[in-house]
Amino acid sequence: MKNEVKKVVLAYSGGLDTSIILKWLQDEYNCEVVTFTADIGQGEELEPARKKALSLGIKEENIFIKDLRDEFVKDYVFPMFRANAIYEGEYLLGTSIARPLIAKTQAQIALQTGADAVSHGATGKGNDQVRFELGYLAFNPDLKIIAPWREWDLNSREKLLAYAQKHGIDISKKKGKSPYSMDANLLHISYEGLVLEDPAHAPEEDMWRWSKSPKDAPNESEIIELDFQKGDLVAINGEKLSPAGLLTKLNELGCKHGIGRLDIVENRYVGMKSRGCYETPGGTILLKAHRALESITLDREAAHLKDELMPKYASLIYNGYWFSPERMMLQALIDESQIHANGRVKLELYKGNVIVIGRESSNDSLFNAAYCTFEEDEVYNQKDAAGFIKLNALRFIIAGKNGRKF
């Protein structure tokens, strides 16, 4: 029953939708509301969220605003990039990887404040409802979960606006606010809705909020060097920064050179296809560099095994299973593969392209020019290849002698 909830922690952005949810929770559940706003690098001022919550009757001690940027990159983005994770061949999982941290922190605040429920603003059609709720239940299976979009009858924009006006919630539009449904963090920004709901319709150029069009990017390329330790980025052009600082710097470089735009139709976990556009400038650079480093530091079979496991790992993140035992098992294997992923990668950035022009690892490179040179060598006997080929062809030879045709 609705009156059984005493206190609820709401994932709160300060925007119209979550402000309506806040008021709806107060009215429908007659409960105390705690707001939680996460700073994961979305690029918006968060103090307005505090003021908005106060204006809606939330006590100061029940307003939580947390800077999670470094934790987000260090404990979520970097581990994911050790795996080179991509969903359905293209999507760098920018929204998916942010939800577990938000859910975990929200559940922790519920414990801290004695709340018996949590609430989110994800719709009943999308993946985020699954990601949030799997996260909540992983940390506290006794929490009641309130998903307003699955309960209320405010099922149109007109009804939402009417509810806001009735309850004195400010509905003034922010200057420069995009008409698209957007989600942003340090790894990416996404766009959905409006003309994008027709997959045949190209997005307008003014939709893209972060990056230059590759056509308008500088005519001069830029060379950068990225340093890695155990698979994680530690420095850009020799400058060591915090995890959040490193990704911020990569984003600046990628946006400048028109890198990281993506327009895809993806298969949602709930069963439908969805068209989305994404900008992941820093992540696109990071993925290219990390794979280049692995090309000289990973054993062949280890690298191939990682590539076989990656789609499963990516699907676990996309579908909301970050805290699952199977994801943690895969992570342990992936992290073991990164012990020798130390070195430097040199890249050229130019009009939407990330071009690898050098890679080196002073202590961990498995590239040995003495073995692969096209010049005369003394370490590799080419005659050995004949026996290698014959043994590997043995099954073909036996089948052929048995009359089988291929």
Curated annotation (Swiss-Prot):
GO terms for cellular component: cytoplasm. It is found in: Cytoplasm. Keywords: Amino-acid biosynthesis, Arginine biosynthesis, ATP-binding, Cytoplasm, Ligase, Nucleotide-binding. Pfam families: Arginosuc_syn_C, Arginosuc_synth. InterPro entries: Arginosuc_syn_C, Arginosuc_syn_N, Arginosuc_synth, Arginosuc_synth_CS, Arginosuc_synth_type_1_subfam, AS_cat/multimer_dom_body, Rossmann-like_a/b/a_fold. L-citrulline binds at residues 91, 96, 127, 131, 181, 190, 266, 278. One of its GO terms (molecular function) is argininosuccinate synthase activity. It catalyses: L-citrulline + L-aspartate + ATP = 2-(N(omega)-L-arginino)succinate + AMP + diphosphate + H(+). Its EC number is 6.3.4.5. ATP binds at residues 11-19, 38, 121. CDD domains: ASS (cd01999). L-aspartate binds at residues 123, 127-128. GO terms for biological process: argininosuccinate metabolic process; L-arginine biosynthetic process; urea cycle. Homotetramer. Belongs to the argininosuccinate synthase family. Type 1 subfamily. This is Argininosuccinate synthase. It comes from Campylobacter jejuni (strain RM1221). The lineage of its organism: Bacteria, Pseudomonadati, Campylobacterota, Epsilonproteobacteria, Campylobacterales.
